[in-house]
Amino acid sequence: MTFVVVPQWQGSPSSRAMRLADGAEAIRTDLPSASTRVVPVPLEAGDEQGTGIARFGSIQAVRERLADALEGLPDTAIVIGGDCAVSAAAVVHVADPGLALVWFDAHPDLNTPTTSPSGTYAGMVLAALLEEGAVDPSRVVLAGTREWDAAEEDMAREKGVATITVGQLADAAAVADAVVASGATRVYVHIDLDVLDPAEFEGLLEPIPFGVQTTQLVATIRELLGRLPLAGATIASFAPESPEKAVDDAPTILRLIAALRG
């Protein structure tokens, strides 16, 4: 398994988005250096280039660099963000007809350039993957999502995307059951750390109350990967206030990595 660190911040709507680069670097220091790669991210914000997507120029450059980095890997990749838009290239890299996508995220990321309140890509990335045909909507599971825009609710309903609430995640098999029922043969796991309860995990730009407990998320991942092979994974949105705060949250992130590695 190879770790690919992508300290991208340009997809975030937050005025403190640069903390995402700090978070990616903090995670990198806990990873085995021999099996870790780093994708360079432009220093500049980038412009929208007529797309309606803020900072699109830089986001597209990073997507291409990440795609190139993944192409040369001999094994499964865990991509470390940065903002959660890094999952775009990572999911496309492993796309096939049997792929399921589990999206652990407080937000569904189902906006488009015409519906997004912020115009930033982190809130559009899942919609973009569906539009590109990278994954069948019937094999997408949103888990732990609890803050929706109206347009996102409409898209999830129209596409038939399955949803598992925070309460339903008390059953460690809930996600695995939904994925297996879809007929998938392998699974990509996207984890935006804001899916976690901010009372347990502090390093977030936009903490949303009443999230998933770490023990529940770890148990869910283990159950899922006990039933289907892992195609790849993302851990994104770590944004510690300081190096000291990063140390406090590190054990949680390492538990999630251990669950993904099996």
Stretch-by-stretch model annotation:
Residues D83, R146, A239:
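Residue-level signal for short, function-critical loop segments
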Residues A106-L110, E147, L193-V195:
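Short, glycine/acidic-enriched loop or turn micro-motifs at the edges of active sites
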Residues A122, A143-W148, Q168-A170, Q213:
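A general structural motif
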Residues G23, A122-V125, E152:
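Internal, well-ordered alpha-helical segments in soluble enzyme and binding-protein domains
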Residues M1-I78, H93, M155-R157, A162-G262:
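Catalytic cores of soluble, metal-dependent hydrolases
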Residues T76-R139, L228-A231:
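Active-site histidine-anchored catalytic micro-motif
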Residues F104, A143, A236:
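Conserved residues at the C-terminal ends of beta-strands
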Residues W148-D154:
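Short, glycine/polar-rich helix-capping loops at beta-to-alpha or helix-loop-helix junctions
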